[in-house]
């Protein structure tokens, strides 16, 4: 969501107009709609009062249900029409699996929202994250919990470079030709660890307290009770 501010500046400067934006909507996206960056908003959740006022008064700001937004059972889910999605992460591993359910120690932070749905549906899924937070590397050998599988992640963007999923060699070439700093994800991991050191691996935990399923019901991972 914070990326919307910078995306608006680029779209206005380059005269780029999108068909629609979707997801949880904030005032930033409302401003982009009003300034002509998008033709419409497909809103599954208003995140601030500016979005609430817009959905009440602007006929181009459409309310949609969670099923319309992301259900694989829907005939035409909105996520399947996304060209690009920008997503965050608490952890990313070298297989491009992404964790948004827990922190690095395994403590549950919340639900994943439409993270895995949009990553699977969009033509290009981008994970935007700093290389480390609070001296903990974001890129690791294996995420604590797989929220979104690496097969659905195309690009990881950090302040030290852009890693492209090896399954997308054509995309890597196009981004490199565009002058972007393409870096192997293993190299990004090493850069982070040279700055922060290699973190201790937290204990695995006890009984299973949650099961993580993909959008079509496939078991992805489990979350275990923390041991103290």
Describe the residue ranges of each PLM region.
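Conserved phosphate- and dinucleotide-binding cores of soluble alpha/beta proteins
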Residues: 2-11, 15-18, 28-228
């Amino acid at each position: 969501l914070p990326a919307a501010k910078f995306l608006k500046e680029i779209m206005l400067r380059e005269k780029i107009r999108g068909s629609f934006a979707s997801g949880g909507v904030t005032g930033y996206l409302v401003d982009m709609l009003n300034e002509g960056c998008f033709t419409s908003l497909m809103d599954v959740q208003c995140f601030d009062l500016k979005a609430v006022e817009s959905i009440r008064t602007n006929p181009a700001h459409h309310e949609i249900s969670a099923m319309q937004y992301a259900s694989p059972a829907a005939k035409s889910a909105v996520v399947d029409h996304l060209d690009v999605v920008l997503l965050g992460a608490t952890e990313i591993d070298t297989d491009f699996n992404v964790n948004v359910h827990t922190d690095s120690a395994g403590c549950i932070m919340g639900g994943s929202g439409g993270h895995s749905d949009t990553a699977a549906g969009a033509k290009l899924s981008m994970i935007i994250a700093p290389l480390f937070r609070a001296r903990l590397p974001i890129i690791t050998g294996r995420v604590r919990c797989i929220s979104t599988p690496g097969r659905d992640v195309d690009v990881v963007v950090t302040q030290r470079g852009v890693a492209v999923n090896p399954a997308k060699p054509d995309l890597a070439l196009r981004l490199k030709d565009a002058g972007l700093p393409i870096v192997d994800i293993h190299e990004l991991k090493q850069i982070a660890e040279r700055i922060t050191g290699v973190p201790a691996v937290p204990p695995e935990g006890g009984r299973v307290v949650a099961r993580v399923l993909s959008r079509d019901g496939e078991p992805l991972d489990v979350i275990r009770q923390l041991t103290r």
